[in-house]
């Protein structure tokens, strides 16, 4: 079952990206390095509820 998640910037805490993931196959939280328009740089984005 795929569920929607939000990715937030680890530096400024802005919620920049929405994506989905499969809860059965992936138990750990997602962390991706993506562009943050508020920080104006690439930062680590972590999954939040």
Curated annotation (Swiss-Prot):
Keywords: Ribonucleoprotein, Ribosomal protein. The keyword Ribonucleoprotein applies. Transmembrane segments: none annotated. It holds the Pfam family Ribosomal_L33. One of its GO terms (cellular component) is cytoplasm. The keyword Transmembrane helix does not apply. InterPro entries: Ribosomal_bL33, Ribosomal_bL33_sf, Ribosomal_zn-bd. One of its GO terms (biological process) is translation. One of its GO terms (molecular function) is structural constituent of ribosome. NCBIfam families: PRK00504.1, PRK00595.1, rpmG_bact. Belongs to the bacterial ribosomal protein bL33 family. PANTHER family: 50S RIBOSOMAL PROTEIN L33, CHLOROPLASTIC (PTHR43168), LARGE RIBOSOMAL SUBUNIT PROTEIN BL33C (PTHR43168:SF2). This is Large ribosomal subunit protein bL33. It comes from Syntrophomonas wolfei subsp. wolfei (strain DSM 2245B / Goettingen). The gene is rpmG.
């Amino acid at each position: 079952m795929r569920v929607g998640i939000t990715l937030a910037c680890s530096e400024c805490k802005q919620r920049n990206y929405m994506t989905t993931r499969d809860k059965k196959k992936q138990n750990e939280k997602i962390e991706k390095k993506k562009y943050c328009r508020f920080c104006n740089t690439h930062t680590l984005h972590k999954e939040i509820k």
